[in-house]
Amino acid sequence: MSRARNSYRNVTGSPGGVSIRRSHHIGCLQAYLRPVTDAGLLILLTCSDPACRTVAPHGGTAPRFSPNPIAAGIPTDGDPILIDISTSSTSNGLCSRLATTGQRLPGSWLIDRDGKPTDDPRVLASEQGGAILPLGGMDLGYKGFGLALFVEALTNALGGHGRADEEPRWGASVFLQIVDPERFGGKTSFLRETSFFAQFCRETPVPPGKPPVRLPGQAALQCRKEQLANGVALYPTIMPALVPWATTLGVPLPITSSAR
């Protein structure tokens, strides 16, 4: 990311784009956005996994895609707008965690092998033959399906390696594009516009007793500030999973809040 950002500063002409194939686990896409927006640049970041099939196309009953997230960072005069959404109704990670703990999803975001909606994450097990619905669910899933195809084109197709290769190992295909507003209408007018519509959205009337409109990334930025000051809150199953690795590698575990 740093290499792409720094190289872009030295290139004139069209916006810069980078394609990566067989990447390691990329993690949360939003984590990569802030350094770019802090430099006053616009960023688009997407990824797919050619070896992963957990999401069904709209109208189908068998998985064909990975969740195919799309992330974008938009600079403003204040905090940036940080967008990070899957083109599926939910993520593999959430389904895995809930299946492990025997919990259900908040909604019927999956389908079983017969195409019936369900909130049971266990249908994603290979022998069950279920799938995650695309963003929009049973009724409007054509929207998520279309976005998933767009991500497939940006990542696997542009990278020259994808599902047609029947990759047996997991590995992300990544597409990154960075745009300098100065090369278009100018940075000043860009920030004027992005800052205006950010504030315009915050000032939108809401029903009585409801919180104000929250921009994408706003809650995450606030959580980051709090956890930098008070410590990082981990999902309950993470620390137990780290214990055997820490023991094997001789690495001391961090002190948890309950042990302080």
List the predicted regions and their residue ranges.
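Short glycine-rich or small-residue beta-strand-to-loop segments that form or flank ligand, phosphate
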Residues: 16-21, 134-136, 176-182
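Glycine-rich phosphate/pyrophosphate-binding loops
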Residues: 42-54, 153-170
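Phosphate/diphosphate-binding glycine-rich loops and adjacent basic-rich segments that engage nucleotide
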Residues: 54-126
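Secondary-shell segments that build the walls of catalytic and ion/ligand-binding clefts
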Residues: 103-163
